[in-house]
C-alpha cells in the first residue's frame, strides 16, 4: 500500500498541498481527479519521491524518505506528464532504460519489444524517439515504466504512478492504456493515475480521490464520489451525473467499447 498522512508541500514559498491524507491499495486502480491547479500532479510527484514534503509517506510500510532511489525504483515506476530528450535515441533504447532502473525480467532480451507490443507500438523499436508524434512518445514512455515493474508483484506489490497517461492519446489508445492499468492491478500491483476525463475515470477506476485547492476533499468508489453537488462545487460549473444533453447533440461514452 502507498499511504500518505498529513502531507504538506510548498513550492517557491507557496503552499500547494495542505494536510492531505491519501491511500492507494494494491489490486485496484486509484484515480486522482480535480480541476487545473488543484494539486493532482504535485500529489503524484510527491508520493513518487520527486518533491520534498512534510508529513509521512510509506511505500509497502517503508518510509519513502528513508528509501534509497534504487530501492524505490524496485517498487514503483513513474510516468511523468511529459518527457523531453535532448539527444537522439531509438525507441528501444528509451524503453530499455526501464530494465536498467528496475529488476524485472532483466534477462529477457525481448522485453522492450513485448512492452512496445503491449502499448500498440509493435515494430517501432528501431525508430528514433524524436521522430514520433506526441501520443506515440507518451506510449513509448509507458512501455519504459512497464519494463521497470513488468512483474506486478515480486514478494510485495509494485506500483505504476501515472501522471495524465492518456492526455495525448486518441480514444482507442486511451482505452488500451487504461486496460493495461486494470490488468496490472488485477495481477496484484497498484496503480495511481491522474485523469481529467471523468467518464474514463468512472469506467476504469476502482477508487477515486478528488482534489480541490490543494486538499483531498473526497475519496471512495466512483459511485460514492461522483455526485452532482460535489462535482459542481469542485469544478465550478453546473454538472449532472448521468444526465443526457438536451436536444439532438451526439455524445460518446468509452463504456460502449468495453461491452
From Swiss-Prot:
Name the Gene3D superfamilies for this protein: P-loop containing nucleotide triphosphate hydrolases
How is this protein situated with respect to the membrane?
Peripheral membrane protein
Q: Could you confirm whether the keyword Cell inner membrane appears in this record?
A: yes
Spell out the Pfam families in the cross-references: ABC_tran
Where does this one sit in the cell? Cell inner membrane
Enzyme Commission designation:
7.6.2.-
Per the record, the domain of life is Bacteria
GO cellular component: a single term: plasma membrane
List, in alphabetical order, the Gene Ontology terms for molecular function in this entry.
ATP binding; ATP hydrolysis activity
The record lists ATP as bound by 34-41
Per the entry, what this protein does is: Part of the ABC transporter complex HmuTUV involved in hemin import. Responsible for energy coupling to the transport system.
Membership in a protein family: Belongs to the ABC transporter superfamily. Heme (hemin) importer (TC 3.A.1.14.5) family.
Q: How does it assemble?
A: The complex is composed of two ATP-binding proteins (HmuV), two transmembrane proteins (HmuU) and a solute-binding protein (HmuT).
The name this protein carries in UniProt is Hemin import ATP-binding protein HmuV
Q: Which organism is it from?
A: Chelativorans sp. (strain BNC1)
Q: Which gene encodes it?
A: hmuV
Amino acid at each position: 500500500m502507498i499511504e500518505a498522512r498529513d502531507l504538506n508541500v510548498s513550492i517557491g514559498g507557496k503552499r500547494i498541498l495542505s494536510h492531505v491524507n491519501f491511500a492507494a491499495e494494491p489490486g485496484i486502480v486509484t484515480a486522482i481527479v480535480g480541476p487545473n491547479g488543484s494539486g493532482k500532479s504535485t500529489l503524484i510527484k510527491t508520493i513518487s519521491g520527486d518533491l520534498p514534503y512534510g508529513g509521512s509517506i510509506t511505500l509497502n510500510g517503508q518510509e519513502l524518505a528513508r528509501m534509497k532511489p534504487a530501492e524505490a525504483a524496485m517498487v514503483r515506476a513513474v510516468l511523468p506528464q511529459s518527457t523531453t530528450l535532448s539527444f537522439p535515441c531509438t525507441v528501444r533504447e528509451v524503453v530499455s532504460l526501464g530494465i536498467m532502473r528496475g529488476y524485472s525480467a532483466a534477462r529477457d532480451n525481448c522485453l522492450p519489444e513485448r512492452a512496445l507490443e503491449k502499448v500498440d507500438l509493435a515494430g517501432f523499436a528501431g525508430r528514433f524517439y524524436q521522430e514520433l508524434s506526441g501520443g506515440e512518445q507518451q506510449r513509448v514512455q509507458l512501455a519504459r515504466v512497464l519494463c521497470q515493474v513488468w512483474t506486478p508483484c515480486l514478494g510485495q506489490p509494485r506500483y505504476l504512478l501515472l501522471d495524465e497517461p492518456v492526455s495525448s492519446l486518441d480514444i482507442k489508445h486511451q482505452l488500451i492504456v487504461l486496460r493495461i492499468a486494470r490488468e496490472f492491478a488485477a495481477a496484484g500491483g497498484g496503480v495511481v493515475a491522474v485523469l481529467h476525463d471523468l467518464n474514463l475515470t468512472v469506467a476504469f477506476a476502482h477508487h477515486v480521490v478528488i482534489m480541490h485547492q490543494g486538499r483531498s476533499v473526497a475519496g471512495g468508489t466512483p459511485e460514492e464520489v461522483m455526485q452532482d453537488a460535489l462535482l459542481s462545487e469542485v469544478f465550478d460549473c453546473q454538472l449532472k451525473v448521468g444526465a443526457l444533453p438536451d436536444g439532438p447533440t451526439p455524445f460518446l461514452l468509452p463504456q460502449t467499447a468495453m461491452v
